Amino acid sequence: MNSPLLDKSLDFSTQIVLFYEAFSKSKKDTTIAKQLLRSATSIGANINEAVYGNSKADFISKLHISFKETGESIYWLTLLKRTNLTGYDFESLLALTEEIKRMLIASLNTAKENKRTPYVSQFYKRITSFLYPIDIKNCHLENVTV
């Protein structure tokens, strides 16, 4: 399923995992890289969880966690860049993190503005299709309330 936000967060996580794998083979301390790995992979995981939230509040909460994780990831990327422990150019990763952060801000603003509307509203369908496009009408799952 195509979703710009999920696709970008998955691309970001993949790049971080590959960076960590290469960096961990060096004899340098990997503490900072491990912190980056945790925060970076948490972004996409929480975006995906938001799609399957039990309520709008849960949806907003998971997106907010993803937003906070982008801030933490930016911190660790900036620290790695400034210390030059790796010799890796982090500009593209920082730019991708900023792009994901902007997308999350837009999604959170829309979600918060429409928080008082019924759970399955036009807004919710629009946002979830942006995050993880599925056809809710043709989704036949037992014991699942949408």
Question: Where do the PLM segments sit?
Answer:
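Short, C-terminally biased terminal segments at protein or domain edges
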Residues: M1-A45, E49-V146
